[in-house]
Amino acid sequence: MITLAICYTINPNKLGDFKEYVAAELGPIRHSGGNILGYFLPTDFAGPTNEALGLIDVSDLAAYEKYRKALAEDPVHKKNVARLEQSSAVLATNRILIQRFQER
């Protein structure tokens, strides 16, 4: 199992727009083969207010490639991305693939 970690730098004044994007993306992500572990938003009481994180599991690298292709072709995803870009809620995105450490 590998996890796609999507690290977002967001405009804290556009948090509502980002939340709408995340809610709208849950369906396309699942439909494309991603298992959503969760989206995590900044808090008002600790840490930076402009960072968010999405964690999505896929079984292996081949499944990740299939997921990325299916998501890129999804018409709802395309609309969501266009709406997000228009809102300027996300300033930067960084994607990394990580694996869970499992103690033996």
Regions found by a protein language model. Name each.
Residues 2-9, 40-72:
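Short, well-ordered beta-strand segments in beta-rich or mixed alpha/beta enzyme
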Residues 10-18:
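Short, surface-exposed ligand-recognition loops at beta-strand->loop->(often short) alpha-helix junctions
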Residues 20-38, 57-95:
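An amphipathic, aromatic/His-enriched active-site/gating alpha helix that lines ligand/cofactor pockets
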Residues 99-103:
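Specificity-determining recognition surfaces
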